[in-house]
Curated annotation (Swiss-Prot):
This is Ribosomal RNA small subunit methyltransferase H. S-adenosyl-L-methionine binds at G47, G48, Y49, D64, F91, D109, Q116. It is an enzyme of class 2 (transferase). Specifically methylates the N4 position of cytidine in position 1402 (C1402) of 16S rRNA. Its EC number is 2.1.1.199.
Length: 341
């Protein structure tokens, strides 16, 4: 989800880069913040979007599931007083922190931030040795729990679907053999095994562990489910004329956002396998191009922007539809609750 997946963000000299909001101008153009408007930033992070929205005169409710981000954002809370509210929460719960039908805009920047990648103790990066954690908050199941406890069949599904890893069976079986001798504890521990069983080829542009680390992070934080629930919640929270803007960095996430807006356009759909559904009242209309990506100039300055895609929709007066997760066709993956038992 980042320019150097699993490996941290670096500048030309190899040092960590400061967090730069991706597609900021495009986000603001789609969101149209202005005095008197109430915007929810579902992924506060380092506050890049929130700062720009506040500068445009709007009021902001910002959410983040990472307590580190909440602590770092207290200076912004003090600086902006009543115009800015910062809440420790997953963005799938945005309805708990905003008036139903009262928001003028919602912006979601999906994925792990460069700051989280650069903190070795968070366990997101295989290039920085640390505990095999990957949780965006301190709660729930860690990546080590998944690797050491999940059935081989579940590991294969997780790596294949969430990481699009073609060597998923080989890696999963190697994990099973190794954990029987000694459990996995660190990022380098797991990355080393993956590199051993699937060595990098000359033509490979990424580290062999990249896709597995991505899959584990998405699974541990239920990132796809969180995104889907956030889209449904935003639909109910936005007033007519309100704007929903989502920035994604991975094909799976973009597919979810694209499917959501396509479904909410209200057009009839069907296939040779399914009956044609009748047209429904659209709850969202398109804003500008169906998808916006970063310019070469931005990607050169901020490599993380290279894979970014922005999609946006304008809320209509039609009533919000039911939150039906079957819309996205998620496979049946292992239960986080059982792994954490």
């Amino acid at each position: 989800m980042v320019a150097n997946p699993g490996g941290g963000s670096t500048d030309a000299g190899g040092g960590p880069v400061r967090h730069i909001p991706v597609l900021l101008a495009e986000v603001l153009a789609a969101l149209a913040p202005a005095p008197g408007k109430l915007i929810l930033d579902g992924t506060f992070g380092a506050g890049g979007y929130s700062s720009a929205i506040l500068a445009a005169g709007a009021e902001v409710i910002a959410l983040d599931r990472d307590p580190t981000a909440i602590a770092a954002g207290q200076a912004m809370v003090a600086a902006h007083g009543g115009r800015f509210k910062l809440v420790h929460s997953q963005f799938s719960h945005l309805a708990d922190h905003a008036p139903q039908g009262g928001l003028d805009g919602v912006v979601l920047d999906i994925g792990v931030s460069s700051m989280q990648i650069d903190e070795a103790e968070r366990g997101f990066s295989f290039q920085k040795n640390g505990p095999l954690d990957m949780r965006m908050s301190a709660e729930g199941v860690s990546a080590a729990d998944v690797v050491n406890r999940a059935k081989v069949a579940d590991l294969i599904r997780i790596f294949h679907f969430l990481g699009e890893e073609s060597q998923a069976p080989r890696i999963a079986h190697a994990i099973e053999k190794r954990r029987a001798e000694k459990p996995f504890e660190t990022t380098r521990d797991l990355a080393g095994l993956i590199e051993l069983v699937t060595p990098r080829k000359m033509k490979d542009k990424i580290h062999p562990a990249t896709r597995v680390f991505q899959a584990l992070r998405i699974f541990v934080n239920d990132e796809l489910g969180e995104l889907a629930q956030a889209l449904f919640a935003a639909e109910a929270a936005l007033k007519p004329g309100g704007r929903l803007v989502a920035v994604t960095f991975h094909s799976l996430e973009d597919r979810i956002v694209k499917k959501f807006f396509s479904d909410r356009a209200g057009k009839a759909s069907g296939s040779r396998h399914l009956p044609v559904a009748h047209e429904r009242a659209a709850t969202f209309a398109a804003i500008g191009k169906p998808m916006v990506s970063a310019s070469e100039a931005e990607a050169e300055i901020n490599p993380r922007a290279r894979s970014a895609k922005l999609r946006a929709g304008l809320r209509t007066e039609a009533a919000a539809e039911a939150a039906d997760m079957s819309l996205f066709g998620f496979p049946n993956l292992a239960s986080l609750g059982k792994l954490g038992g």
